């Protein structure tokens, strides 16, 4: 390799492939500034790192979620259709019943999806409430009816007793995102709560040995440097899965009509995230179909090794069968 063929920053980053040690901040900043014609070299490196350090080469982490409680959220997240501060047109309903949850979980199992998440709108549960107890009952029911299914949850901010309860009921993963660089959370995401509360929840979950799924959203007005701040902040939180969403601007939210993120910058972000987190599951969530479109397969070759399938909270996703076929096609890029 010579710098006339491959950008020097990419060459320097090859030490991650050689050693398995996470990328340093200085090199990450240089990679963030790469010109477009060097992005595929970076993507290739990230894919090699993923194959060497992030589990079985052909294994993709696939999960499905259920919006078990929708709308009427008192938080003012700027991207979210479920906030009552926004005027998006969505279905609004209270916590679903066990039968509805079981039906949707069975669909995931029948489709070969091993991870199923119960998601609720709202700030969260600092204490055990009757509604939280109903969720615990759902978790127990899924373990009983669908043994082998990894039951996950995303219920917002937690307290000590609710974190401990989820651990006692065998939750497989818990999702709570820091969304953006912590320094920009209040102006880019929300100011009715703080990112500190979310980080505290991650630490409580880790205290109780619950694997954490924690990532962010790209394209809400952050710079590449601020994306790096988020990526390195995740390094300090010992998370097991990093979901990266790409903003899908929703009518009736403050980000309605917002310009979509640049495709090459998204690829760079995923690739750098892989180099900073060589052994972590990096999951591509929202934005695959609507923003990345024809390029979503490229992201799966740029360090990602997981995806959310079957639909999101308030927007449609890809059919599970289509994602299964995508995974099969990607296997040819894992053969060495």
Curated annotation (Swiss-Prot):
HAMAP family: BioB. It is an enzyme of class 2 (transferase). Catalyzes the conversion of dethiobiotin (DTB) to biotin by the insertion of a sulfur atom into dethiobiotin via a radical-based mechanism. GO terms for biological process: biotin biosynthetic process. Pathway: Cofactor biosynthesis; biotin biosynthesis; biotin from 7,8-diaminononanoate: step 2/2. This is Biotin synthase. InterPro entries: Aldolase_TIM, BATS_dom, Biotin_synth/BioAB, Biotin_synthase, Elp3/MiaA/NifB-like_rSAM, rSAM. Its EC number is 2.8.1.6. [2Fe-2S] cluster binds at residues 152, 213, 283. SUPFAM superfamilies: Radical SAM enzymes. [4Fe-4S] cluster binds at residues 73, 77, 80.
């Amino acid at each position: 390799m010579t710098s006339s063929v491959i950008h020097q920053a990419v060459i320097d980053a090859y030490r991650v492939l050689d050693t398995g040690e996470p990328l340093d901040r200085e090199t990450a900043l240089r990679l963030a500034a790469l010109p477009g014609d060097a992005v595929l070299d970076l993507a290739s490196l990230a894919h090699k790192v993923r194959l060497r350090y992030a589990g079985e080469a052909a294994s993709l982490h696939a999960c499905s979620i259920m919006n078990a409680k929708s709308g009427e959220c008192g938080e003012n997240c700027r991207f979210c259709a479920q906030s009552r501060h926004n005027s998006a047109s969505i279905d609004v309903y209270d916590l679903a019943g066990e039968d509805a949850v079981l039906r949707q979980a069975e669909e995931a199992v029948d489709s070969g999806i091993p991870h199923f998440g119960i998601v609720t709108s709202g700030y969260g549960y600092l204490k055990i409430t009757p509604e939280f107890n109903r969720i615990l009952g759902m978790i127990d029911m899924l373990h009983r009816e669908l043994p082998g299914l990894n039951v996950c949850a995303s219920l917002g901010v937690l307290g000590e007793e609710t974190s401990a309860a989820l651990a006692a009921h065998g939750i497989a993963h818990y999702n709570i995102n820091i969304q953006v660089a912590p320094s920009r959370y209040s102006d880019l995401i929300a100011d009715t709560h703080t990112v500190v509360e979310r980080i505290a929840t991650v630490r409580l979950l880790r205290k109780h040995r619950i694997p954490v799924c924690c990532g962010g959203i790209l394209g809400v007005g952050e710079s590449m440097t601020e994306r790096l701040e988020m990526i390195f902040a995740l390094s300090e939180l010992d998370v097991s899965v990093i979901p990266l969403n790409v903003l899908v601007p929703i009518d009736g939210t403050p980000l309605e009509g917002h310009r979509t993120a640049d495709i090459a910058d998204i690829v760079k972000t995923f690739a750098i995230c892989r180099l900073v987190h060589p052994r972590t599951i990096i999951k591509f969530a929202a934005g695959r179909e609507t923003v990345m479109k024809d390029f979503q397969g490229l992201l799966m070759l740029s360090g990602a090794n997981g995806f959310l399938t079957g639909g999101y909270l308030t927007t449609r996703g890809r059919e599970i069968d289509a994602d299964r076929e995508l995974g099969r096609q990607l296997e040819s890029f894992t053969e060495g």
